[in-house]
């Protein structure tokens, strides 16, 4: 299992990014969570097979149709997750 922390910057709030990411994560079988940050970015932790995590990271670099992703910072992290949660702001 691979676990990554993502910090996603750009026009990523108010564009259905979190809900879209939750749906994509469930489609790919990725666990973790996603939430908005006060600075206007989106933060997520994703966990799954190397292939599934890579696919979700690739999706995050594009985002949903109304988003404009400028940057995605990745770092390895630890934890155990079950399901994918859209957290409150």
Curated annotation (Swiss-Prot):
Residues 3-88 form the Acylphosphatase-like domain. PROSITE patterns: ACYLPHOSPHATASE_1 (PS00150), ACYLPHOSPHATASE_2 (PS00151), ACYLPHOSPHATASE_3 (PS51160). The active site is at 18, 36. It is an enzyme of class 3 (hydrolase). Keywords: Hydrolase. It comes from the Bacteria. Pfam families: Acylphosphatase (PF00708). Signal peptide: none annotated. Its EC number is 3.6.1.7. One of its GO terms (molecular function) is acylphosphatase activity. It catalyses: an acyl phosphate + H2O = a carboxylate + phosphate + H(+). InterPro entries: Acylphosphatase, Acylphosphatase-like_dom, Acylphosphatase-like_dom_sf, Acylphosphatase_CS. Belongs to the acylphosphatase family. PANTHER family: ACYLPHOSPHATASE. This is Acylphosphatase. The gene is acyP.
């Amino acid at each position: 299992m691979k676990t990554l922390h993502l910090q996603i910057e750009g026009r990523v709030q108010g564009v259905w990014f979190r809900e879209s990411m939750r749906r994509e994560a469930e489609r790919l079988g990725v666990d973790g969570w996603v939430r908005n940050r006060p600075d206007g970015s989106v933060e997520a932790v994703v966990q799954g097979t190397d292939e599934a995590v890579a696919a979700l990271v690739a999706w995050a670099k594009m985002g949903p149709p109304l988003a404009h992703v400028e940057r995605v910072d990745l770092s390895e992290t630890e934890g155990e997750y079950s399901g994918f949660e859209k957290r409150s702001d």
